[in-house]
Regions:
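Histidine-dependent nucleotide/RNA phosphoesterase domain, centered on the 2H-phosphoesterase fold
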Residues: 2-237
C-alpha cells in the first residue's frame, strides 16, 4: 500500500469516529463536571438531609475508624474562607467541621476490630500488612499542588471543590487495589474537603443564596507531600 493510500484510509477511519480517543475527558475535567452537577442538584432541592458521621451505628462500634487522608494546613486559607464559615454557621442545621481536622479523604479502610464481623471491619494485623504494601506502591509518587474552592454542597454536607490535576484519584486507585473487600459505593471517587455537616432534615432556607458568592472563589493552595493514616475514635461525637 502506498503512503498516500495509507493516509486516505487513516483519515476515513478517523472521520468515522464521532469522538476521537484524544477527546475523551481526563480526570480533572471529569471532576469539574461532577462538581457542576452537584451544585446544579443543590439548586433544585429545597431541603437538607441529616449527614452526621456520628450515627448510632458509628457510636456503637468498639474500634476506631481508620482513614487515609491528606491533611489541609490551617494557613492554606484566605480570610474569605473564614467569612464563609460564619455564613454557614448562621443556619441552625449546620455543624462546622473543626478546622484542625480538615482533610481530603483518599480511602476509608474500616473499623478496627479483633474479630471482624463485616466488610467494613479490619484487624490491626491486616492494617499493618496493608500499610506495608502501600508504602511500596506509593514510593514513586511525587508531591503535588492542590487548589481548594469554590464552595459546594451535597444535600447533607458542605464542601470545597478540589483541583489537583487528578492526583488524588490516582492515589485512590492504588490504595483501593489492596483493600481485601472494597467498600460498596454508589458513586465514583471524588476528592472533597468537607467543611460542614447538616445535622437534621430541614428546609434549606437561604443556603444556595448564601453560598453563591463563594461558588467560584479559590480559598487557597497547598502542597501534598505526604498522606496520613488517621484513627477516628468512635466513642465520641
Amino acid at each position: 500500500i502506498g503512503f498516500r493510500e495509507f493516509v486516505k484510509k487513516s483519515v476515513r477511519w478517523l472521520l468515522r469516529w464521532r469522538h476521537p480517543f484524544w477527546w475523551l475527558p481526563d480526570v480533572p475535567s471529569e471532576q469539574d463536571e461532577s462538581y457542576r452537577r452537584i451544585w446544579s442538584h443543590l439548586r433544585q432541592i429545597d431541603r437538607v438531609a441529616d449527614g452526621r458521621h456520628d450515627t448510632e451505628d458509628f457510636l456503637n462500634r468498639r474500634g476506631d475508624l481508620v482513614i487515609i487522608c491528606a491533611r489541609v494546613p490551617a494557613e492554606t486559607f484566605i480570610p474569605e474562607f473564614h467569612t464563609l464559615l460564619k455564613v454557614l454557621d448562621t443556619h441552625d442545621y449546620v455543624r462546622l467541621v473543626p478546622p484542625d481536622t480538615h482533610n481530603i479523604t483518599v480511602q476509608e479502610l474500616g473499623y478496627l476490630s479483633e474479630r471482624p464481623n463485616g466488610r467494613d471491619e479490619i484487624t490491626p494485623q491486616w492494617l499493618d500488612e496493608y500499610l506495608e504494601q502501600c508504602l511500596i506502591s506509593l514510593k514513586d509518587f511525587r508531591p503535588f499542588d492542590v487548589r481548594v474552592g469554590g464552595v459546594n454542597s451535597y444535600a447533607d454536607a458542605a464542601f470545597l471543590d478540589i483541583h489537583d490535576n487528578g492526583w488524588f484519584s490516582r492515589l485512590h486507585e492504588v490504595l483501593v487495589d489492596f483493600v481485601s473487600q472494597p467498600p460498596r459505593t454508589r458513586y465514583p471517587f471524588l476528592p472533597e474537603l468537607i467543611i460542614a455537616q447538616y445535622i437534621h432534615n430541614a428546609p434549606m432556607g437561604t443556603l444556595v443564596h448564601d453560598l453563591t458568592p463563594y461558588r467560584d472563589m479559590e480559598f487557597g493552595l497547598f502542597r501534598v507531600e505526604q498522606i496520613d493514616v488517621v484513627r477516628i475514635p468512635t466513642d465520641e461525637a
